[in-house]
Curated annotation (Swiss-Prot):
Lineage: Eukaryota, Metazoa, Chordata, Craniata, Vertebrata
Signal sequence annotation: 1-27
Localisation: Secreted
UniProt KW Nuclease keyword: no
Job of this protein: May participate in lipoprotein metabolism.
Pfam annotation, one family: APOC4
Keywords: Glycoprotein, Lipid transport, Secreted, Signal, Transport
Record carries keyword Signal: yes
Gene Ontology CC: high-density lipoprotein particle; very-low-density lipoprotein particle
Glycosylation sites: 63
Main location: secreted
Protein name: Apolipoprotein C-IV
Amino acid sequence: MSFPGCRPQALASLCFCVLVLACVVACQQEEPEGTLSPQPAPARSSWSLVPGKVKEWVEPLVNRTREKWKWFWGPTAFRGFMETYYDDHLKDLGSRARAWLRSSKDNLLNKAHSLCPQLLCRPSDQN
């Protein structure tokens, strides 16, 4: 059987497509519509194995590091660190802050007076 204006190669391709379509329709009709079949597990590619391998290599390293540094995060070491930090940096913070504010205020007033014209900001004893 030949169709007018069709090449033999096109006819073979058309027949193949019709055959595939018929197989797909037949396979869909074989399953009852009320039942759900479990989806097959996807084939595991080499990229899907990467997270497992990374976890396998990193987990022992993390566990060893955690064990070695457990003493640092204990209450005695941390308390000692905080006491030393307070003694070194925060003990006299209030007095240092007050002194800094005083000197900043004095510096700011001196700059303001230096920018002020002599006529407006003349000292009061020069009347």
